[in-house]
Amino acid sequence: MTQRKVRVRFAPSPTGALHIGGVRTALYNYLFAKQNGGDMILRIEDTDSQRFVPGAEDYIIEALTWLGIKFDEGVSFGGNYGPYRQSERREIYKKYVDQLLNDGHAYIAFDTPAELEEKRKEIANFQYDASTRSQMRNSLTLSQEEVQSLIESGHQYVVRAKIEPNEDIHVNDLIRGEVVINSSILDDKVLYKSADQLPTYHLANIVDDHLMEVTHVIRGEEWLPSAPLHVLLYRFFGWEDTMPSFAHLSLLLKPEGNGKLSKRDGDRLGFPVFPLEWHDPKTGDVSSGYRESGYFPEAVVNFLALLGWNPGNDQEVMSMDDLIRLFDLSRCSKSGAKFDYEKGRWFNHHYLLEKSNAEIADLFLPIVESHGIQTTHAYVEKVVGMMKGRVNFVSELWDLCSFFFIAPTEYDEKTRKKRWKEDSAVQLGEFIEQLRAREPFDVEGTENECKAWIESKGYHLGNIMNAARLALVGEGKGPGIFDITEALGKEESIRRIQRAIEILK
């Protein structure tokens, strides 16, 4: 048998913002496909019309595009296996629903929600299965004429899978090994609803995966309990020889490790759980996103890749190309991965440092201008070079280095009490003259000359430098004094020191 080309799919439902766990699933599918020279498909599973949220589909595509997760075919990308939106495949599914009914692997059920609720009250832990289906209104208990009459009179119905009890179903999982589940614990899942003439996830994804020639299904472990049903459906259709390999990914857990990561955890601890900012059209709520929070896409990708997978060594920093080369499903964890959001910040800091000063200046200049400052790209680039090692995000730069653009009008009281001495005003007055006389006004030459002067006068170097920093910055933090003076220029440096002398003397 010839080996089939690897084809994977990411198949989200457009029911809201894409959770970061879903992003990781998409990433792992992409890495696996690219490593094996395969295709990545985007399929939109919009069979649940009641949960459809306008804008969600566009959000999903924009988010994955931002992260560099590229599709070879699918919704918005075209391809030979379309349509790729499940709501556009009604006629395709109906054919396979009829096949299951004709072959005796499914049946029609007319039970109303009220009748089902009554059964749940009557029978503890009720589920619709081989032990209870004989008590219900369905094509197994009604005559063919009664069934036909109900359908023709417009009664809504569902089609349920007919699961026979007492059979061990084997699911071969690429991460977890062989999983065996007895069919007796399975219920007769709904496969199709006449109300909207659409299948449920269980039928639609099996039919689509088969027709789209998907070879590997890589998805979250929440679908593992459904895998036995999916294996049975492949058998019912006679598609066992082309059934894809399964890999069920472990959950992303709360930072504390107790339970699945949720949006509420992000709100509570101050980190996003969505790739992009999300404006909920139903509630008007706005949820933060990694992009808008200042994360670089390569940092998010690197961070997510290591949540539940490792390369087998101590390597942490990996580009997308590195990940494609190293990714191995067998090294995915079976247990959940704690969401370490501080590690995400560390990755962003790393990638920020890797970018050139010019690239960071491109991002920081609009922030500077938003404060009413008119300056040059070259000046911002110089400031960035001094300060980027101190931040995790570009957005943090302003609070650390606004003094490069706005002269201090106040002086930190704690620093003033500690660093401004009785003789600081006199010594800084003399220091000004050293700065005024210095040409060229560079970093190294000015520093060497001023330190030599301080030594010749017998002054304490720390006293003058600390007082000068307070005058130039307004507090006791910042880069080297002579880096600051060179950036500000001679006139501005002198003006700031003179003003501090007048106020603090």
UniProtKB/Swiss-Prot annotation:
SUPFAM superfamilies according to UniProt: An anticodon-binding domain of class I aminoacyl-tRNA synthetases, Nucleotidylyl transferase
Catalytic activity: tRNA(Glu) + L-glutamate + ATP = L-glutamyl-tRNA(Glu) + AMP + diphosphate
Pfam families named among the record's database cross-references: Anticodon_2 (PF19269), tRNA-synt_1c (PF00749)
Disulfide bonds: none
The protein's role, per its UniProt record: Catalyzes the attachment of glutamate to tRNA(Glu) in a two-step reaction: glutamate is first activated by ATP to form Glu-AMP and then transferred to the acceptor end of tRNA(Glu).
Family note: Belongs to the class-I aminoacyl-tRNA synthetase family. Glutamate--tRNA ligase type 1 subfamily.
Name listed for the protein in its UniProt record: Glutamate--tRNA ligase
